[in-house]
Amino acid sequence: MRSILFLLLISSSVFSQRVITGKIVDKENSTALSGVFIRDTKSDNWSISDKDGAFQITIPYLEDIVLNFSILGKMESNIALKNNENFITVFLEDNTLRLKEVVVTANKERKYSELTLGTNAINNVQAFSLDDVLKQLPGQTTTDFNLNEFKNIVFRTASKLSASNANKAFGTSFVMNDIPISNNENMQALNPNSGLADDFGIKGNTFTNTNRGVDLREISTNNIEEIKVIQGIPSAKYGDLTSGLVLITTKVGNSPYRVSASIRDATSELNLTKGVKFNLNNSMNFGINYLDSKADPRDNILNYERINGNISWQYKNNDATIKNTVNTSFRMNLDNSKSDPDDISAQVIKNEKKGFSISNNLMWKPKNLWVDGINVNASLSYDRQFSRRDKWMNTSPSAATDTQEEGIHEAIIVPSQYTSVSTVEGIPISTFFTLETTKTLTNKSNWIHSLVLGVSHRTSVNRGEGRKNATQEMLNFYTLSREGNSTIGFRDYSFTNSKTEYQISTYFEDRIFKKFKDERILNLDLGVRFDNQMGNISLQPRVNSSYTLNETFRLRAGLGLSSKAPSLNQLYTGDRYIDKLIGSGIYTYPGVYQKAWIQTIITPGDNLNLKPSKAYRTEAGLDIKLPFASVNLTGYYNKLYNGFSGQKVPVYRVIPKAEIIVTGTEIPNYNIVGTEKFYYMNNSLTNDRSSEDTGIETTINFKKIKSLNLDVSMNASYTHTKDFSDVKEYESSASLTSAERYGVYNPQDGIMDSFTTSFNFNYHIPAVGLLISLRTEHILLQNTKTQTSNYPNGYLDSELVYHEIPVEDRTNIQKYGHLIKVRNETQSKIPNILHNLHLRVSKDFLNGFSASLYATNFLNLKPYYYDDYDNKILSKIAT
């Protein structure tokens, strides 16, 4: 099918070309600018200016040409050429606050629904990490400033702390310089299938982010040139995602030394960047960032440190047909929770990550081949992760075992006081490679087809020592004391037991442009992506379109499918060890003996049947350009299905029945007296999670009030979310003698909605380089409702055979009162509108020095509300 389409395009096409030449000049001093990157916005053909600022670019069509000009330190410029204009002179201005127009908010692109944040928008919030920048987007809110827990983000959803939210965060893709940032190989979890939450964290702050997306704290903003956010339908070029795409472009090129320091509460940050131009064809940029953040300025108990460094080298040949960029970076992140002298039982946590990445981006315009361009991207990422938790235990004596074999074993008697130590060591390694070709064709009717064909390959592997015991040989043991308990015993597990996860993909895209006689314009991107993710094959069509009716109205629409592969931590969890104390527990005769026996049951643990989660995304929009404002309105419906979900299913094993023999002061022993059924809950991961997000968002940019030098903009977002699962819930019968062993219930569905607005007021005086920005946030609606299912649909008997209960009998207390649960439906909402206001004052001086003061919640608003239990709650937006 692809070959037929390709031949049809060729047969109806003519190779119309137009050569554009020109010169690029620095507006400040009228000197020529070399190394400026020139890109055709439709075909992605490109060129680079020479030492005299001159350039030449071949355009494979004749009319409606728009060229983009960009270089580090200058304001990016788009210039539309007249149909008879083949030579242009371009003036680029310094990107400072002395520009006549400064954009400090997310800019809605005129093609589809993507949002772009430039340098000024990135600096608008004095960001300490990428998380601070993305909070400016519609539907997001600024929460308490806290760098002592991992940060992720989800777009276009009202779900917060839920399994669906974790799925969506895991499915949000971050791509830096055309290289995806992967979290698939992160396995820093103590017991992936145990149900134990927050393996490494303290006081509600979770450090590790397995299965929950990229930790945005690790990405500093000092070296970022531009951020593009696609909340709708991504290009077919991008895969392994379900919930959104963030494209990051870093700085490369000549620039002066830039030293910056930021201080906020007990957080301080220091940045150094410099760009060097060795000659006409070679330039280098390097930067280093250090951040130190304490949870409390009065002590150093909870602390986060980050050190990032990067070196970028860019080369181009003399005739500007090859552009190659090599990026290397190193990183160190440390979460450190030290011992609290006032709390001997407090956990001591250390979570450390050190690593490096190297990538190469090659752009080549071959002269003697049929294609216009060939792009090759490759990368390698290597990290060493170490997580450790120390906790002082003061409990009654207990028994444990470290055996890795089934059967009855003599237990280790754990003293009532000891230090429990849990450690996980990982070495995540990821690679990525993509090869892409481009070709632009036009036909006699001036239809422009920009064709893209590419293949990609990515791998994820972890070669760490894994979960292991440290010192004292009695660490983090969990022992069952009764039947039915789902707690799992801890055992060593090497991550080398996991296999390499691979993804092989190919994609094709036809980007169509047509301008009609009456100024109507059609943009249509037709793409398809083929993914092979660990043997799971999927075909993902994606469509984006826009139709400009006139200078006032433009329609937009798009739809597409995408998928996200499971992580290694979800696939490879290790065997589950169920430890059952036999007899009456620990047998003690003071001064003579202390004995206990544990029966160990082993069940396979890996979730190798887990498949990629998938998403179906649609959106439709309307852009209106009025004399006083530009309005962008977008409605969307997104569905996540085959999402990752935990499941607990009752199982039983027939095991030997042991009888303990105790005779006076003699050492106790046991005899096998038959068999018995042992019931327990088996934990696993399945593809049974689903979620639907329906919403509408708008962005309005008002015309500048020139008499006041005031720019005003606003955005609003409403989202309705429904989370649901196909995983049944099981609960033991309240009657030990009944034939019904477990009740079977529907899962708890969640319904949420959220309505937020934000206003931006920017007062700008270019002559003195002064900018005063006021950003307001308003939460008008935030509701959460969790539906309960107290009445069983059926039950499992002693053989765990399912029996359906007739609908009319499910509420019958006489028959099934021992299975009916008493659990109220939970619902929460904010009774009043919550407000937050942030102020920034920035000044650029002529000597290159700049200063900025940024205050969040500068009016010190303290919005309280009361929950369903009449507890007074302080909203998290009070930063």
Task: Give the residues covered by each predicted segment.
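Short, acidic, small-residue-rich periplasmic hinge/interaction motif at the N-terminus
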Residues: 25-29, 39, 68-74, 84-123
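N-terminal periplasmic "start-of-domain" segments of outer-membrane beta-barrel proteins
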Residues: 39-41, 45-52, 101-128, 150-154, ...
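N-terminal periplasmic accessory domains that precede
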Residues: 87-91, 130-133, 152-154, 175, ...
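Extracytoplasmic beta-strand/coil segments of soluble accessory domains associated
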Residues: 134-200
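Short acidic/polar hinge/loop motifs at secondary-structure boundaries
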Residues: 179-230
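Outer-membrane beta-barrel transmembrane domain signature of Gram-negative proteins
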Residues: 406-411, 415-521, 693, 742-747, ...
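Gram-negative outer-membrane beta-barrel transporters
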Residues: 637-639, 657-788
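C-terminal beta-signal and adjacent terminal beta-strands/loops
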Residues: 640-642, 778-802, 806-819, 832-833, ...
